[in-house]
Amino acid sequence: MANPDPVMVAYGMPSAPLTEILTPTTPTLGDQKAPVLIVEFSDFTCGYCGRFYRETLPALKAEYLNAGKVWFAYRDYPRDEKGWGLVAAHAARCAGEQGQFWEMHDRLFDQHARLGTGIIIKLAKDLKLNEKKFAACMDSEKHVPAIMADRELATTTLGFLGTPGFLVVRTDGHRFADALMIPGAVPFETFQKEIDRLLKKR
């Protein structure tokens, strides 16, 4: 979902435990002691999510994550209850069992327009995953409930209507406050403005 003129909502959301927006297994990047957290809700088959991955996330890493000012979390929002978005989300989690969630995340977005069984198997081989364990994990579909719980949080609790969606919050590592929802694909400058606003509240 493109959103060049984003509508910001949820300023002043009450302080709440971080566990309301993260789980113990939510993949994250950056220093978890950083004062600002961005939670992305995304679909590996979404073109606008791929744009964020290619254009905006690298700038956020360079400007904020590498400086210890922001940390980043990825949660699943497959747009359909079945299909390659769900399969890809499961593949990333299965790779995560072998310590390579982010490596699979990157490759899935690099190949998002070509996703299929053959591509996912090739990506697992390229990452030198234990193929037997990866295949067993994929066949089990054991991560589907957690993936759909992410989707439920994005749609029902937070009210996102498409992908990607972002929750930007100030945090002390245990609780969050001053939450801001950014629906849709927005440029780095939009994140920069809101991150800097939150950093000034430290």
Regions found by a protein language model. Name each.
Residues 23, 57-60, 167-168:
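Short, well-ordered amphipathic alpha-helices
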Residues 4-23:
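Short coil-to-helix leader/linker segments, especially the first N-terminal amphipathic alpha-helix
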Residues 1-8, 122-202:
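C-terminal cap of thioredoxin/glutaredoxin-like
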Residues 28-29, 115, 182:
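Short clusters of hydrophobic/aromatic residues that line enzyme substrate/ligand-binding pockets
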Residues 3, 16-17, 64, 100, ...:
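Residue-level recognition of alpha-helix termini/interfacial anchor residues
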Residues 34, 39-125, 130, 161, ...:
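Structural alpha/beta surface segment adjacent to cysteine/selenocysteine redox centers
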